[in-house]
Amino acid sequence: MIGSFESIIIDCPDPRALARFYSELLGAEIVVYDRDRAELVPPGNPRPLLAFQRVADFIPPRWPSQDVPQQMHIDVKIDDFDVAEAAVLALGATKAGSDSPTFRVYLDPAGHPFCLIKPED
């Protein structure tokens, strides 16, 4: 082994705002924040799950177009699409794309795509 996983860093225009969005979405605690960086940790884990860093002149990904590629996205496992969708939209997400039996695509407030996923019954 060369090393161990530390965290995923996401570029954005406002780290605090995006950290609040993902904190509510994932039930994680915001443990570090200042003007240029914010970090989330999941309950019971001392390591950051996600970190957000301010980028000047941030250009959000364009999904599904690849004019500005998404480069990565987060999958969030859920139990009920309708309940989860209402919650993420209330947090400031935007629906992006059509529904599938196993996933739905949204954009976070900074424009990064993420999916709500539910295994088929």
What are these regions (language model features)?
Residues D57-W63:
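A short, acidic/glycine-rich surface segment
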Residues M1-A19, Q71-V76, I117-D121:
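N-terminal beta-strand motif that seeds the catalytic metal site of vicinal oxygen chelate
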Residues V41-P42, W63-Q66:
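Short secondary-structure boundary/capping segments
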Residues Q66-V88:
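Mid-chain, well-packed structural core segment of small domains
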Residues I2, I9-R54, V83-V105:
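Core segments of cupin and vicinal oxygen chelate
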Residues D108:
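Short, acidic, Ser/Thr-enriched surface-loop or helix-capping motifs
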